[in-house]
């Protein structure tokens, strides 16, 4: 008998949500996360209305909204600094939901905690150094200079765009050439509006600026441009 039904490599939003859902359905699940503590990085912190509907269906919405989530109600689109319309996304999208923003590291922590409450075993600060595919796959873990192999019925790789699980599983990867770049910053005590997000487009320079409020006078700002226009 395998040690686990499922071993999930990666304990971020996707890995923790999947593990929680499967544990609630009776599976024996282990999550292995290499980070001992989640760090702030520039990444998406805005969940579209359809994503909020998915969060409800996955059973993680209440965890997110109670721990770190925030609902800006509107979307302000601006062209070269001039507003061309403030849109109520809940009133104008099929799922009738407001989008959700959140601080990514806290969302990761909240979902890992929810997964543990559902019965998931979580190992943090542990690296996966090998996955052996087969009828009974095995996963080799490494921590504090020691290695151990565990067997499972299914390995789920949720270890990011540089996934080693994908490589160990023999899956092909296709990448587009770099065409855009994106930079972001988290600002506290900002005077930016808290009730709507803002997208400012400059099509002539192929650039975009985004502001996503997270409540409590905190917002994430992004600046994006095509690679050729970033100078």
Question: What annotation goes with each model-predicted range?
Answer:
Residues 15:
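N-terminal Rossmann-fold NAD(P) dinucleotide-binding loop
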Residues 48-110:
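Active-site-adjacent segment of FAD-dependent monooxygenases/related oxidoreductases
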